[in-house]
């Protein structure tokens, strides 16, 4: 027993010498006991969908982390990202949209609630330029959310300047790998939410297993703290007319909460995510609103027969809608975002 104690004492002395040397070279706090590290709750930006906020387990898109939103074309990826930007701006945050696809529609963004007059946009010519711009903005510490749309459009400069049909094997994957190694630490230090929008492609000749993959290599999958898969389920109709589409978002990777949670919500053409519909559906699933047959009720008050009637009633009674949303957040364990506590304020 005495020998064990003596060995432990010698180890601690050796550790103290090593820590002292490290501190001189790299500064105080380079290595420290875990108990000395202050635990800071991760700040988040709401997604515009309360069901998706719940599915993420932390209340939205995490700041100081990298998030990938991927899916097939026209599934609602950019719409979701624009809602995140709108929510950040409502809370005093600064947002940047790096439009590598050169396809952002300011009129559509405005309809989703984005303050286009205060949205910063970049339309880079090639992939390296886009990622260097993102790095500079992140290092400034002044930006709350950066959206890169999309990874598939981050074409390396060599490929753009090369001949048509010339083989450019793995250049984009190497570009993403090099960039993400630099961006990961910078994102954490600046507390910026970095969102990459990505597409789904199919591998050629895959007979077994999932043939679907995303461009840009494996680096983004590895460095992302959260990955959201967006799927379009079907059309939303009203009186036989198509008004929008139903979306399912699956959290396929989550380093902050249990993964594989799912959320479904409606996206209305020209309006974006139907917030009231989402609140009604989520409240009904959690028992905040009761559904008897086709009737929706909140407490003793009948809201209407069918979701459209309930939606109409809550539009006319916004104070009740606010109360229902608050109860949904309480029941689900989410803290209601306080618009007075700006996400634009950087943590010390």
Swiss-Prot record:
- What InterPro entries does the record tag this protein with? AAA+_ATPase, DNA_recomb/repair_RecA, DNA_recomb/repair_RecA_CS, P-loop_NTPase, RecA-like_C, RecA-like_N, RecA_ATP-bd, RecA_C_sf
Protein localization = Cytoplasm
NCBIfam families, sorted: tigrfam_recA (TIGR02012)
Chief localization class? cytoplasm
Q: CDD domains, alphabetically?
A: RecA
What is this protein's record name?
A: Protein RecA
User: GO terms for biological process?
Assistant: DNA recombination; DNA repair; SOS response
- Function recorded in the entry: Can catalyze the hydrolysis of ATP in the presence of single-stranded DNA, the ATP-dependent uptake of single-stranded DNA by duplex DNA, and the ATP-dependent hybridization of homologous single-stranded DNAs. It interacts with LexA causing its activation and leading to its autocatalytic cleavage.
* One Gene Ontology CC term in the entry: cytosol
Q: Which family does it belong to?
A: Belongs to the RecA family.
Name the gene that codes for it.
Answer: recA
Q: Where does ATP bind?
A: 71-78
Query: What domain of life does the native source organism fall in?
Result: Bacteria
Picking any one GO molecular function of the record gives: ATP hydrolysis activity
Its keywords, alphabetically, are: ATP-binding, Cytoplasm, DNA damage, DNA recombination, DNA repair, DNA-binding, Nucleotide-binding, SOS response
